[in-house]
Amino acid sequence: MRGRCRRLLALLALLMLLPAFAATAAERRLTSVGSDTLGELLQAWAQAYADGDATLRFQIRTPGSAAAPAALATGAADLGPMSRAMTAEEAADYQRRRGREPGRVRIAYDAVALFVHPDNPLRSLRLADVARIWAADEHCGGADAMRWSELGVGGALADQPLLRLGRNTASGTFEFFQQAALCGGGYRTDVVQFPGAGAIVAAVARTPNAIGYAGLGHANGLVRVLPLARGDEDAVLPDAATVIAGRYPLARPLYLYFNRADDGRPSPEVAAFLRFALSPRAQEIAARHGFVALPAADVSRESGQLQ
């Protein structure tokens, strides 16, 4: 009698576990490894995309754009968000491992903004001044700017040294800024590097003599964004109009890279998410996060890759 009871209890326990086993078996997962700049947007997209779908799970890691190519090539990621294009070396290494080129969809535009403390009286900068602040040599700008007075700042800040903040080498923003603002030259050795853009903005907010760069989506009321000029043009703030028109000097496209199947297309699960990323709803979310939504012509072109 006791043996039958034990067997019955064991059977009941097994039956209670079956729904959990079934749910686990049916669960689908998308893994994203890459850009810190795109981290919060990917989280928001994942939440919106997975609403009402209990079987879909997203895993989003943001070590930086440099991590995306290898994560895709090894199969550790389904999506590789990058705030810059893959380098020729990264693309060649990917093709060597996978036997084909990666897929890539442009998902939004961004601007790398220059941030100063609200009490800093500096009104604007020229691109050549940016090189004077961050570059290790003078081939792109002019003589190094060491104190704020050398950038035209007066008052209590004039004799203060510049505290230069920037991203670390794993960041796509680090590489984009190096090419677009420093003429491809090296960074000064006294640039304080951060793994995340949010930490740069937070440091500027509490340090009157600091200046940093990060994606525009990290702007907040605790810091001030500087207008920026190219050559003799008027300085402009980064916004949707100046980015799309090409007037803001540090504008850039943002990408989601993916693995292609033998037919050149992404997997059905990845393709469905990419179509969502190009949808009006997702583009509206991107705009709310400080990015610039794709124009209709861009959406049409990028969507063509998913047909």
Identify the residue ranges that each predicted region occupies.
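Bacterial N-terminal signal peptides
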Residues: L9-A20
